[in-house]
């Protein structure tokens, strides 16, 4: 464990979720991802996702497939990417730290998803497109 913490490639200050991945085929840079990177990435991802949803719901233009449905589908990419990597690592390399992170993150992520899915303004816009 001590050796891993001295590895200059694996420092908590360089959160790989906050940079574009320059890896082959865009795969996650697993050698640079540490457990302490996830909560800040989840928090930023949720914040960005909320801002993207707010942009959809506050759009004064008539609701269309493009500015509502496609925008909703495109929203939350950073959060989705972080959740995907987190899920893969929890399944493949679980340990006490990752399990503790799951216990901490899952209620926050569930509440975030509920907030988005139950957003009255978003529902109205989607219904306008449907009607």
Residue ranges and their predicted role:
Residues 1-5:
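Hydrophobic h-region of N-terminal signal peptides that target proteins for export
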Residues 6-131:
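Zn2+-dependent metallopeptidase catalytic domains
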